[in-house]
Amino acid sequence: MDFVSGADTVMAKYLVDTNVLSKFFAGDVDVKTFLGTIDFAINTIVYIELAQGSIKKQQRELIERHLSTLKYYPLTPAISKKAIELIDKYSAAEGLFLPDALVAATVIEHDLELVTFNVKDFKFIKEIKVIKP
């Protein structure tokens, strides 16, 4: 896995959410085509959610092979702090959950755009741009 820190000069433009990659691994041609046109990364939460969702060993190995080729943003103290701020601001009013807060915080801290089918889960966070593939 290509671990990317905020100090690295090689940056992705987009962070892809779990639901998009789930469709990719399910063989969605439109998603595969879309992902082939953008420079994207994943973060720790997306990686864990995909690993958790792959029940069969073969499926998990396939997913891990693909994920190992992607840019990857690990959790950092800055991301954790931003996620806490987002939870404080949006958890009660908008129902923001921890995984989505960590995804949004990664997007904010690395100045990315979020690619997700779950636009409603993030639309109230004004600091990020959300794109539906």
Name what the model sees in each region.
Residues M1-I42, A51-R65:
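Short, well-structured N-terminal submotif of metal-dependent ribonuclease cores
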Residues D2-A12, Y72-K120:
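Active-site neighborhoods of divalent-metal-dependent phosphate/nucleic-acid chemistry enzymes
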Residues T18, T44, P99-A101:
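Conserved glycosyltransferase catalytic-site signature
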Residues L21, Y47-L50, S80, F122:
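A generic structural signal for short hydrophobic patches within well-formed alpha-helices
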Residues V31-L35, K120-E127:
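Short loop/helix-cap segments at secondary-structure boundaries that form the rim of catalytic
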Residues Q59-S68, A78, A83:
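Ligand-binding grooves and catalytic loops that recognize ribose/phosphate and carbohydrate rings
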